[in-house]
Amino acid sequence: MESRKEKRAFLIGRFQPFHKGHLEIVKRILSENDSIIIGIGSAQYSHTVVNPFTAGERHLMISRTLEKERIYNYYLVPIEDVNANSLWVSHVEALTPKFDIVYTNNPLVRRLFMERKYEVRSLPMVNRKEWTGTKIREKMIAGEPWENDVPDPVVEVIHEIDGISRIRQLSTTDEDITQ
């Protein structure tokens, strides 16, 4: 009997933070594939308003969430940016296990993988009005409720690392401090 080749998908995002929309996308991808590689993009950035969390913190957010969901068929790979788009796919390939299909809604990522002959699929965004990293970070800074927008393990990690205090402090200017 011939064995079936495992079908492995690739998804990349900054996950600043990992939210319920990301979780739904992971579940949808896994409904069509045997496993998923989740690339933690812009892994070298942290401690800014746009990228407040480290790659390690994002790794914790994702792995704890997937464990709670009883999802075990995944790989988490931090991927630093390469400031040469023509080299980026090779960079990703060097860091990850082989994959068959790429899921992205990012036009540049789509183009780069298509040029390398990958099958690229998009997924519908889930509750995009509320579940975006930008919107969630804005809520954190403003002191608005954000906890319902992310899975419970993400809330726990953010509290463990004092993430709310961090992002609020990062959102201030030196003029705010001297007043």
Curated annotation (Swiss-Prot):
Organism taxonomic ancestry: Archaea, Methanobacteriati, Thermoplasmatota, Thermoplasmata, Thermoplasmatales
Presence of keyword Zinc-finger: no
UniProt name for this protein: Nicotinamide-nucleotide adenylyltransferase
GO molecular function, one term: nicotinamide-nucleotide adenylyltransferase activity
EC number(s) per entry: 2.7.7.1
Entry-linked NCBIfam families: arch_NMN_Atrans, cyt_tran_rel, PRK01153.1
Gene Ontology BP annotations: NAD biosynthetic process
Compartment(s) where it occurs, according to its Swiss-Prot or TrEMBL record: Cytoplasm
